[in-house]
Amino acid sequence: MTVYGSHEGVGEGVLASGTGSAGLSGMEPVTLEISGKHWTFNSLKDLMGKASPMRSGDVTAGCAASCDEELVAAQMLLADVPLAQFLEEPLIPYEKDEVTRLIVDTHDVAAFTPVKNLSVGAFRDWLLRYETDEQTLAALAPGLTPEMVAAVSKICANQDLILIASKCRVVTAFRDTIGLRGRLSTRLQPNHATDDLKGIAASMLEGLLYGCGDAVIGINPATDSVPMMQELLKLIDELIHRYHIPTQSCVLAHVTNALEVMRAGTPVDLVFQSIAGTEIANGVFGVNLGILQETYDAALSLKRGTVGQNVMYFETGQGSALSGRGDWGVDMQTCEARAYAVARKFKPLLVNTVVGFIGPEYLYDGKQIIRAGLEDHFCGKLL
């Protein structure tokens, strides 16, 4: 039995497990006593879900804490879990999920070395240290898995998430550079209800006059067809080159359509795709790692970037795996962090987390949406 000291204002914390090792061991249940009440967690997956700050989607999925006391108990226990345990105990089976295989197979053991002996709680303290700077975090990133980063985010206050994320720089480039300190880039989104080219052109010019569009000029087409995608891409490309605008274009259609228009010689800058953190959820989007790799390679081969070759544009969002019945019982925020492992493989220019987009059944109100946005920003920056 492993016994933890008292936690001020909470009471005595006692962790009971089948072994004398610190943290959780395999799938053995663990129990924490707080003020005379015992809270039991059956697995690392269960502990991660119960340690997540409340959100409606986790309640619907049945993996959320039942009350604030259980949430605190789970967070206290999670803080003592060794980071290395996430390498030993995948939340989603390696044999049944290609995203898990990607995470495990690409883990950089050497990069992980500086924090390999830390617990989740000690890792939080390490991240908050003044000495942990931008260069240190950049070197560490390949050694972190999404589950490690998701775990530490669950025991961070909002201020912690903001402070730690502010230490990280994620700089990408295509025709311009995004992510430098002190800069803010915006997407120009000249959508039209009927994909009318004149209406879209007018909207683009108006947006440019407002100084928008340096991140991307990206259109959500009303109809997801190859001919319309070609027309829209040609329109944006003509505008960019006529006025020598240092930005990039994207039509937010499926990657298979993008692959088809590239083969036809249509000018494609960025390739868009919605992605998720599990193989099943990505299958709902009609993609897998193989399709993404094929499209990524095709876009790279065009060599259309002038200052960089980050050619992918991904969209993610907490709840996508749950809505696609591909969550494996894992909480929404951890599934979302796993989507960033998919994104990381393809070195994207942009990753857009559409926080709260699915609806209140996943993130109920402004408080939950703000928390989710801070978590996503934190996890994406660290990874």
Regions found by a protein language model. Name each.
Residues 4-5, 15-18:
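Mature N-terminal, pre-catalytic/accessory segment of carbohydrate-active enzymes
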Residues 20, 24-201, 209, 216-383:
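Anaerobic metallocofactor- and corrinoid-dependent redox/one-carbon enzyme cores
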